[in-house]
């Protein structure tokens, strides 16, 4: 009788597994939080109180399928967590961005004003580098799959996919609100006369014209890479979906 019961139980389990396998894949969990919940989490008197404010699904963020925190253009997309998109990070001084970069794509030069970054190459091969401050020298690397590098807080840095197929990096931060400032677009966001003086250009119109040609992030990188990979078309990027998001 005991053997029979075990066999019946196995049949039931196998049937349940089979049924689950045939069901449509579930949609990514909605981990987002309202401004009110974020404020409550920030002001929680203890970690236990903060834990009670979160739902189970708010501890999971689906980088692959998320529609939150996405910046997308011709060179791929970056998906970044934030307090409102992934409230489980609140109080832990951590954040993350995953870059899904197309062949010859570049995550344009940018800074994180409030965080140091450690960047891990999950797939592919990247050229990466940073410039920290005046009188420093540029530091650059070729990073293979499985390697990592550090970008100090506030340093201008970038990542270029050197391969002819999509690649991926994972960037972690020591601040749940690292911020991001894309270098070129921020510079040309200054008053045109200030930008003109900085570039030693006399014509404000020239500065305004240059600003019109700035690519959106992530962009398609060097022509050499495009030629090597047999890619055709302009390296100019199309409009990004969310320029202000916290891309790496």
Swiss-Prot record:
Superkingdom of this protein's organism: Eukaryota
Residue positions binding Mn(2+): 110, 112, 117, 157
One protein family per Pfam: Cupin_1
Compartments reported by the entry: Secreted, Cell wall
Residue ranges constituting the Cupin type-1 domain according to the UniProt record: 61-207
Gene Ontology MF term list: manganese ion binding
SUPFAM superfamilies: RmlC-like cupins
Keywords from the named record: Cell wall, Glycoprotein, Manganese, Metal-binding, Secreted, Signal
InterPro entries hit by this protein: Cupin_1 (IPR006045), Germin (IPR001929), Germin_Mn-BS (IPR019780), RmlC-like_jellyroll (IPR014710), RmlC_Cupin_sf (IPR011051)
GO cellular component, one term: extracellular region
Glycosylation-annotated residues: 200
Record-stated family: Belongs to the germin family.
Other facts: Spherulin is a major encystment-specific protein.
Protein name: Spherulin-1B
Species assigned in the record: Physarum polycephalum (Slime mold)
Lineage start: Eukaryota, Amoebozoa, Evosea, Eumycetozoa, Myxogastria
């Amino acid at each position: 009788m005991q053997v029979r019961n075990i066999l019946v139980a196995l049949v039931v389990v196998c049937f349940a597994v089979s049924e689950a396998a045939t069901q449509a894949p579930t949609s990514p969990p909605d981990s987002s939080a309202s401004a009110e919940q974020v404020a409550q989490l920030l002001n929680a008197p203890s970690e236990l109180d903060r834990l009670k404010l979160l739902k189970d699904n708010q501890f999971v963020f689906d980088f692959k399928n998320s529609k939150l925190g996405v910046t997308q253009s011709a060179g791929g997309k970056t998906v970044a967590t934030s307090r409102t998109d992934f409230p489980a990070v609140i109080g832990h001084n951590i954040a993350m961005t995953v870059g899904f970069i197309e062949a010859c794509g570049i995550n344009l030069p940018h800074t994180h004003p409030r965080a140091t970054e450690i960047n891990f190459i999950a797939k592919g091969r990247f050229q990466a580098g940073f410039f920290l401050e005046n009188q420093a020298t540029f530091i650059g690397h070729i990073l293979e799959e499985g390697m990592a590098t550090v970008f100090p807080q506030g340093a201008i840095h970038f990542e270029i996919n050197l391969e002819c197929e999509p690649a991926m990096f994972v960037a972690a931060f020591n601040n749940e609100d690292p911020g991001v400032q894309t270098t070129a677009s921020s510079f040309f966001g200054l008053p045109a006369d200030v930008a003109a003086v900085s570039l030693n250009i006399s014509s404000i119109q020239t500065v305004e014209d240059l600003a019109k040609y700035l690519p959106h992030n992530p962009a398609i990188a060097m022509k050499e890479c495009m030629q090597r990979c047999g890619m055709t078309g302009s390296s100019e990027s199309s409009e990004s979906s969310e320029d202000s998001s916290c891309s790496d």
